[in-house]
Amino acid sequence: MRKPIIAGNWKMHKTLAEAVQFVEDVKGHVPPADEVISVVCAPFLFLDRLVQAADGTDLKIGAQTMHFADQGAYTGEVSPVMLKDLGVTYVILGHSERRQMFAETDETVNKKVLAAFTRGLIPIICCGESLEEREAGQTNAVVASQVEKALAGLTPEQVKQAVIAYEPIWAIGTGKSSTPEDANSVCGHIRSVVSRLFGPEAAEAIRIQYGGSVKPDNIRDFLAQQQIDGPLVGGASLEPASFLQLVEAGRHE
């Protein structure tokens, strides 16, 4: 039985004071980690303080991206070594906003995934199709290609620890959402791709999230689907009460 994982992606929101207050408000109320994994992925500048604030609790702190190199002349970048040193646990890789706005490619994402495992970070690897690709009937082909390239070079044991987040680009921050059944179908296809590449044990163990306008009022519909192990949530993760509703929903699935 795969443990649900509820991850919030704050994107470029909050001040340091607001971020710390959020963690103080929720850390004592998240469900036990043996029931559901609760993650907040915050801006780089806040990570050190948030890891300290969440220390000793069941709330995990993640980053929203990273570079693939341990160090070097990469102005403005943050390395996996730096994140690990801070005590960060998870890192989102290949989010569509990174691909679209910052020219990240499948090959770059793969380098980051390999680097994350090398340094003991758990990657949340994003994939998803555009509206045009969806309307052309290319959803399964697009996500299969992204997943295959992102996981290249990993071992089955590493794949078992990874998280894949299916986020259809047309549903991110738009208020539109894939139906739970459609999302489940794509997540099932992703699992079949993992099975083909790494075997059925890895496919059964890997956790696959759905992201795209998930909120407290619809999360249970997605969690009820067999292939969906939790959501990657944007806007609905910004308020403590909303985030706690999300993780509590995961506790009962």
Curated annotation (Swiss-Prot):
Pathway: Carbohydrate biosynthesis; gluconeogenesis; Carbohydrate degradation; glycolysis; D-glyceraldehyde 3-phosphate from glycerone phosphate: step 1/1. Its EC number is 5.3.1.1. It catalyses: D-glyceraldehyde 3-phosphate = dihydroxyacetone phosphate. Belongs to the triosephosphate isomerase family. GO terms for cellular component: cytosol. InterPro entries: Aldolase_TIM, TIM_sf, TrioseP_Isoase_bac/euk, Triosephosphate_isomerase, Triosephosphate_isomerase_AS. Homodimer. Substrate binds at residues 9-11, 173, 213, 234-235. NCBIfam families: tim. The modification Phosphoserine is found at residue 213. GO terms for biological process: gluconeogenesis; glyceraldehyde-3-phosphate biosynthetic process; glycerol catabolic process; glycolytic process. It is found in: Cytoplasm. SUPFAM superfamilies: Triosephosphate isomerase (TIM). The gene is tpiA. Keywords: Cytoplasm, Gluconeogenesis, Glycolysis, Isomerase, Phosphoprotein. Optimum temperature is 60 degrees Celsius. Thermostable. It comes from the Bacteria. This is Triosephosphate isomerase. The active site is at 95 (electrophile), 167 (proton acceptor). The keyword Cytoplasm applies. Changing residue 14 to G: Displays poor thermostability, with an inactivation temperature of 37 degrees Celsius. GO terms for molecular function: triose-phosphate isomerase activity. Involved in the gluconeogenesis. Catalyzes stereospecifically the conversion of dihydroxyacetone phosphate (DHAP) to D-glyceraldehyde-3-phosphate (G3P).
